[in-house]
């Protein structure tokens, strides 16, 4: 690696270089190599990322000599010195002698959060947890050998969840089946096959009538476009606001959070990006909008955090739905070195449910967070 500076003469002067050391690796491991996971939206499961022989870290370089009136900086890498995958996330330049330290914008009450508990679901590969608005049902999806299926647990008088029961009528799609909202008025189900250019979005609205699920038709969005086969969604309790985590031509990075408002004809208007404060240059998704229509919890790998994907909270600042507060990390008691995502907050019981991956295995976890802490109003 070599750094050179041009002072306006058109010639670059070397101001820092490293000679190859064939015995000592340039970077040292900062965490176990098998802790890297990503959330594969197309397969709706957590996959182990390709192994990286030498994990990335942060390197601080202080120039050995000053160059006055520098107008250009050239950084040369010799990637042939190290085998395996290579990736440079960012390069920062500062005139300070103090190194720039990455910091995590952590929620103020993170130290008060209780210990996280595992919801026992032996033999299942849980994802997309949802609590019904009456607090009596835990709904989640689990991936079998053939497809994703929907299961429901009933809450007993002791507050414990019953053994899961498969909901056949909610598991009819050929591969993807998941619930994003389960209310007394309507249910939002994802994973529906759809044709692009038809305004269909892969979601449908259901109603539970006499213990039977009745489809109210496909959820349609004006000019809907999504690079992936599926998306993650959340919807306001009255159905007027829809928020999606998708990737389009207008995303700031990978997938972004978008909102859409319901029209008089029952369809939804054009998706609008929720802004640069909440959407990073990486991926945002897995959102849940709480009942105040101001608080949103979601998962992202685009902000300083503890692992691959962390869970954050943000607050809507005005009526445009495009201005949000800086996302706050829910802290290391919730977020691990691995994948933490698909959050769902049960306001009635004041518990956050989420999926955590440990050594490639997904667990459904729960933790108590007071409503007065998580929701500002």
Name each model feature, range by range:
Residues 1-98:
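Trp- and acidic/polar-enriched beta-sheet ligand-binding modules for extracellular glycan
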Residues 98-377:
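Short, conserved micro-motifs composed of acidic
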């Amino acid at each position: 690696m070599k750094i050179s500076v041009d002072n306006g003469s058109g010639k670059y002067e070397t101001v820092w270089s490293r000679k190859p050391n064939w015995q000592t690796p340039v970077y040292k491991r900062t965490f176990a190599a098998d802790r890297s996971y990503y959330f594969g939206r197309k397969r709706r499961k957590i996959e182990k990322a390709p192994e990286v022989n030498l994990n990335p870290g942060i390197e601080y370089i202080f120039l050995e000599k000053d160059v006055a009136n520098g107008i250009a900086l050239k950084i040369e890498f010799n990637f042939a010195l190290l085998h395996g995958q290579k990736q440079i996330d960012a390069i920062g330049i500062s005139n300070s002698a103090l190194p720039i330290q990455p910091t995590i914008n952590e929620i103020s009450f993170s130290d008060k959060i209780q210990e996280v508990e595992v919801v026992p679901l032996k033999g299942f590969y849980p994802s997309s947890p949802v609590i019904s608005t009456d607090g009596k049902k835990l709904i989640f999806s689990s991936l079998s050998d053939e497809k994703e299926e929907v299961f429901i647990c009933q809450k007993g008088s002791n507050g414990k969840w019953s053994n899961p029961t498969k909901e056949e009528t909610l598991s009819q799609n050929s591969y993807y089946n998941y619930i994003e909202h389960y209310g007394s008025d309507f249910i939002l189900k994802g994973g529906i096959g759809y044709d692009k250019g038809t305004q269909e979005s892969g979601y449908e609205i259901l109603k539970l009538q006499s213990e039977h699920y009745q489809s109210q038709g496909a959820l349609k969005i004006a000019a809907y476009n999504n690079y992936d086969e599926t998306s993650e969604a959340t919807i306001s309790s009255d159905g007027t606001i829809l928020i999606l985590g998708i990737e389009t031509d207008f995303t700031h990075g990978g997938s972004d959070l978008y909102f859409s408002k319901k029209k008089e004809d029952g369809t939804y208007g054009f998706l609008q990006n929720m802004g640069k404060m909440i959407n990073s240059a990486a991926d945002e998704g897995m959102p849940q909008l709480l009942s105040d229509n101001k608080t949103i919890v979601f998962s992202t790998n685009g902000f300083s955090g503890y692992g691959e994907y962390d869970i954050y909270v943000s607050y809507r600042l005005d009526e445009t739905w495009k201005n949000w507060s800086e996302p706050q990390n829910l802290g290391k008691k919730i977020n691990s070195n691995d994948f933490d995502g698909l959050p769902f907050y049960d306001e009635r019981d004041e518990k956050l449910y989420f999926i955590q991956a440990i050594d490639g295995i997904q667990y459904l976890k729960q933790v108590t967070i007071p409503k007065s802490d998580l929701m500002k109003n």
